[in-house]
């Protein structure tokens, strides 16, 4: 049964953010824990899957945690472009932000930060 909104699976510690019904989702892994469920025919995100959510939601003493988007390295250039476009667009960008970390000022590492306050508020 489809349920729009948030669905938390406690045994797997996975939070599903369902945007619309679609049985044809292809998953694009932004990293090992954050995946976009995409309707490939329409190039549209239908689900955001957050695995090990309790780890992703932990705050540090400095604020929310950010995670490298190392899943992009495994994608073709076309899929990488699509993943970045979708991640920057509604409804996905309501739940996460993408920025760039530049260690040493030369290397560019895309990172992702979840809006955990918004996720927790909507789950309550």
Please annotate each region the language model reported.
Residues 35-50:
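Short, well-structured hydrophobic secondary-structure segments
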Residues 1-33, 40, 55-62, 66-124:
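Intrinsically disordered terminal and processing segments
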């Amino acid at each position: 049964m489809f349920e729009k909104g948030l669905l938390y699976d406690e045994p797997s510690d996975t939070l599903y953010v369902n945007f619309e019904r679609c049985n044809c989702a292809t998953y694009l892994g932004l990293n090992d824990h954050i995946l976009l469920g995409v309707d490939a025919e329409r190039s549209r995100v239908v689900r955001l899957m957050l695995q090990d959510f309790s780890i992703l939601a932990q705050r540090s003493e400095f604020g929310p945690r950010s995670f490298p988007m190392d899943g992009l390295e495994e994608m073709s250039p076309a899929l990488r472009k699509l993943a970045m476009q979708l991640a920057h667009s509604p409804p996905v960008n309501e739940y996460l932000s993408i920025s760039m970390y530049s260690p040493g000022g030369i290397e560019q590492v895309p990172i992702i930060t979840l809006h955990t306050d918004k996720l927790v508020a909507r789950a309550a």
